[in-house]
A protein has these predicted regions:
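Oxidative protein folding and maturation machinery
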Residues: 1-45
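Alpha/beta-hydrolase fold active-site loops
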Residues: 56-57, 137
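Generic structural signal for well-ordered beta-strand positions
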Residues: 47-48, 149
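Thiol/disulfide oxidoreductase modules built on the thioredoxin-like
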Residues: 111, 120-166
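Conserved redox-active cysteine motifs that mediate thiol-disulfide chemistry
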Residues: 53-54, 60-81
Length: 186
């Protein structure tokens, strides 16, 4: 489709911009491998995305200083309870600069799911760049095979999130079988 646009842009005014945008976002297409990460958890363990191969993974990028992120915490707990015992893991990736404040919130609120933090935090961190994060909260749904199913799933507070997650189980190979992507970086 992008190549077809060249016919409508004979002076090549817009094509380079569209090509750059396409190149930036193709890594997040449905079926593309999600970038792996290695992050410290609130309990001191090291967590990698590939640790959850074979499971549906709901990624929640957040900050403890963001009001919208904090409001969604209650919904996150409720959503995780609804999927308890199912083949899904909720990974909450904090982009907090202040490790102590993050750990305290995780401990005091007894936040469920996998709680990890990006050392140094912020939207300029390597993880934020690899996932092209522009803001928090940001949610992503990764299939059992480690590929993106949805880079803009329903928010934790949305009633439709439950249906969307239920419909995502077992969908990973549907998208990746038709597309030849390079191997996921580990």
């Amino acid at each position: 489709m992008l190549a077809d646009f060249r016919n409508y842009d004979p002076k090549n005014q817009y094509y380079p911009t569209l090509q750059a945008d396409f190149n930036q976002h193709k890594d997040f297409a449905i079926g593309a491998p999600a970038p792996d990460f290695k992050l410290p958890s609130a309990t001191g363990d090291t967590v990698h995305l590939h640790d959850f191969a074979g499971k549906l993974v709901y990624l929640n990028f957040w900050k403890s200083t963001n009001g919208l992120c904090l409001r969604d915490l209650a919904y996150a707990q409720e959503l995780m309870r609804k999927f308890e015992g199912k083949n899904i893991t909720f990974i909450n990736i904090a982009l907090d600069e202040n490790e102590q404040a993050w750990k305290q919130l995780v401990t005091v609120k007894k936040l469920p799911g996998v709680q990890v933090r990006v050392p140094g935090g912020g939207l300029r961190s390597m993880v934020a760049k690899e996932y092209a994060l522009q803001e928090v909260p940001t949610y992503m749904l990764v299939g059992e095979d480690g590929t993106f199913l949805n880079t803009k799933p329903k928010r934790l507070s949305s009633r439709a999130a439950v249906d969307e997650i239920n419909q995502s189980f077992g969908k990973a190979s549907t998208y990746t079988s038709a597309i030849d992507f390079p191997a996921t970086k580990k």
